[in-house]
Each structure stands twice: as structure tokens, then as C-alpha cells.
């Protein structure tokens, strides 16, 4: 292969520039195409999105005052909360990453930065949707399990809606957003075991005490897929058609499945001319969706819980059971997409690349989709087209 300018590549260089290379000592097939930046060793970076004060304009403060006050009629509270929801959540930045294009050689690369949401991640989209549903149905308390980001989002949404919030966290995790969650008025309960154990406890409490269950899966799947589908509509609003591919970091698979559902709706209504390929990226050997895709499994298969280890970088991505894994796997395969792994080091390095090149401070785990996209471009040079990477959280 030759360079774009006709000169041959030096040994060890890739056909798409020198910004990335395969991790040393690991087979390309084993890593699922994982990439490493050619920079120094990664430094520890916190997993949770950065906590920042939530400052609303006076008119929205007035809406929150109505939504959170039980003295107002339910219809007025719902309207006020919806006004805050529509104003503050979603409609996040989509911008062309020209500097990363120059680093990698992949042209027409767009970054969809969901760190612009109130608590800094895409989880605000589903948290506000669930709080809206809870308020409409007459609940006074919402509950969910979390390792940090969803708990912060749900606690904020509940406080705006005048709802109590109980968040269940796995005792073995260091929830760095705990002070923020409590500051929003939520009650935190530690649960022995992993995230899945915390989900089970939250659901049991919801059933026994008649609380609103805001956990992913089950009856909430439709609500959450619709909420994440808004990402697709926002991309369409900017590009006026579907990109060639959309790359997303995955954990439970809900965000990816929702984005696919949104584009499918646009395609069926004749708004877009094609379905984008759906790409998944996640932590190395710690996510059932990527593992199942690479192994060729027909359905999303659980991993061995004893082999899942949390780090300061991979926490937003890891689990042994992906709640919406089957939906995510179907989205990848039905669009002829792909999935690959990302190591902690590569995610930390790409986080620094996004910061230095495009001025966005992102969670390292948010770059797993970008890594998966560039891995495929390294192996099989992608066509000159438009590509979107969803960056799910700010640092």
C-alpha cells in the first residue's frame, strides 16, 4: 500500500497515518482490531463524568419550581418538567473532527458529544424520560442501580420533578459521583456484589414498596430506546441523511440499540437514503456484546462474572450481562456493522487525542467507538464517506 501522496509507507506505519497502531504483543484477531496511539503510557483517569454546578436560566428555574411542587396540578407539573427536559437534555454538539482527520487520514469524521447534557453523559436522556414517566403515572419515588453516571442523572431528574430517588450501588465499586448524587437529594444504598446484584435489589425494592423502577430492560426498554433514538434524529437534522456508519461505546447495549431504532424509523419514513452501519466498541474482553459478535454467537452470551475487573477507565463499559445485548447484537449484524475491543491504555490515549485535537474533554471510555471505527479503517481502508462517532460523556 502507498501513501495518499504516492510515497510508500515506512515499516510499522499504517495506510491511514501514524496516529495509531496495534497494541504490541497481541494478535489483531484476538483484540478484535483494537488500536493504540503511539504515545506514552496512559495515566489514571476517573471513570465518572465531571460534576459541575447545574445553573439554569431564571425562566427554567421557575419551571423547576412548578414541576417539583406537589401543590400544583399534575398537568402543570408535567408541562413544566417537559419544558426543562426539552430545553436542557439532548440537542448536543455534532462537529467535524478535522484535526483527527489529519491525524488518522479518515476523512469526514464527525463527533457527537453527549457530554453536553446536564450531568455530562448520555444517561440524562433516559433519566429524564423515566422521571417524566414516573411523574405522569403518579409515583413519588424512583429507584435504579448505578455505578455512577446513571445515578447522578436520575438523581438530578428526580429532584427537578419533585420525586424522591433511591440509588443502589455495588459495594465493591468506588462510586466517584456519590457526593453529587447525594447533593441532588438521592438516598444511596450499598449492595453486596456486582452491578447486576444492585439491579436485582433495586427491582425487589421497587416491587415490594411500590416504587418506580427506572432500571434498564423490561417495561422500560421502549422508553429508553426512544430516548436514545433522539441521537439519531439530531444527527439527521445536521447531516440531512444517514452517515455511512455510527460508532458507539457499549455496555448494556441500550444506547446503541436506541440509535439503531432511531435510524430505522427515519429510513422507514423515507427521511434517509440508507441505514448506517452500526459499530460497537467496549473494554477488552469485558463486554458480552463485543465478545458475542467476535465469537459468532447467535445471541448475546453472558461472560464469567469472576473474570470481570473494574478499573478507573473501563467501569462505564464492563459487565458480564448486557441487558439489551440481543438488541444491540442484532443492530450490528443487520446493518453489516462490526464490533471490537479497546484497552484501558488505548481509551486513555484517545481521550487525550480528542482533547488536544478537538478541544473536548471526554471520558476515556467514551472513545471505545472511535477506536473500533479506526481499527476497521486500519485493516480495510474505509470509503470516502461520512462517519459519526458518539462520545457519550465528558471528563
Ranges and model annotations:
Residues 2-395:
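PLP-dependent amino-acid enzyme catalytic core
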Amino acid at each position: 500500500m502507498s501513501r495518499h501522496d504516492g510515497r510508500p509507507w515506512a515499516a510499522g506505519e499504517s495506510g491511514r497515518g501514524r496516529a495509531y497502531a496495534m497494541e504490541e504483543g497481541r494478535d489483531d484477531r484476538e483484540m478484535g482490531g483494537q488500536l493504540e496511539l503511539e504515545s506514552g503510557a496512559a495515566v489514571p483517569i476517573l471513570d465518572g463524568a465531571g460534576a459541575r454546578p447545574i445553573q439554569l436560566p431564571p425562566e427554567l428555574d421557575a419551571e423547576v419550581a412548578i414541576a417539583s411542587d406537589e401543590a400544583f396540578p399534575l398537568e402543570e407539573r408535567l408541562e413544566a418538567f417537559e419544558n426543562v427536559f426539552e430545553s436542557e437534555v439532548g440537542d448536543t454538539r455534532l462537529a467535524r473532527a478535522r484535526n483527527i482527520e489529519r491525524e488518522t487520514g479518515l476523512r469526514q469524521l464527525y463527533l457527537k458529544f453527549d457530554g453536553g447534557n446536564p450531568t455530562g453523559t448520555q444517561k440524562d436522556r433516559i433519566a429524564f424520560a423515566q422521571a417524566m414517566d414516573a411523574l405522569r403515572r403518579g409515583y413519588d419515588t424512583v429507584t435504579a442501580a448505578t455505578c455512577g453516571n446513571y445515578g447522578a442523572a436520575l438523581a438530578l431528574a428526580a429532584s427537578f420533578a419533585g420525586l424522591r430517588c433511591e440509588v443502589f450501588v455495588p459495594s465493591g465499586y468506588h462510586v466517584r459521583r456519590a457526593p453529587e448524587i447525594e447533593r441532588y437529594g438521592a438516598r444511596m444504598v450499598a449492595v453486596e456484589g456486582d452491578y447486576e446484584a444492585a439491579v436485582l435489589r433495586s427491582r425487589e425494592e421497587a416491587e415490594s414498596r411500590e416504587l418506580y423502577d427506572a432500571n434498564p430492560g423490561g417495561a422500560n426498554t421502549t422508553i429508553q430506546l426512544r430516548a436514545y433514538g433522539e441521537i439519531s434524529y439530531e444527527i439527521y437534522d445536521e447531516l440531512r441523511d444517514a452517515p455511512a456508519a455510527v460508532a458507539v461505546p457499549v455496555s448494556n447495549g441500550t444506547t446503541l440499540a436506541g440509535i439503531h431504532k432511531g435510524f430505522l424509523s427515519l429510513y422507514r419514513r423515507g427521511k434517509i437514503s440508507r441505514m448506517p452501519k452500526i459499530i460497537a466498541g467496549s473494554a477488552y474482553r469485558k463486554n458480552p456484546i463485543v465478545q458475542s459478535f467476535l465469537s459468532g454467537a447467535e445471541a448475546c452470551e453472558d461472560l464469567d462474572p469472576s473474570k470481570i475487573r473494574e478499573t478507573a477507565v473501563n467501569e462505564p463499559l464492563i459487565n458480564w450481562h448486557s441487558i439489551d445485548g440481543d438488541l444491540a447484537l442484532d443492530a450490528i449484524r443487520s446493518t453489516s456493522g462490526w464490533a471490537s475491543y479497546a484497552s484501558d491504555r488505548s481509551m486513555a490515549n484517545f481521550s487525550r487525542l480528542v482533547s488536544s485535537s478537538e478541544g473536548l474533554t471526554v471520558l476515556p471510555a467514551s472513545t471505545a467507538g472511535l477506536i473500533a471505527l479506526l481499527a476497521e479503517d486500519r485493516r480495510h481502508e474505509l470509503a470516502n464517506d461520512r462517519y459519526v462517532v458518539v462520545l457519550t460523556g465528558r471528563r
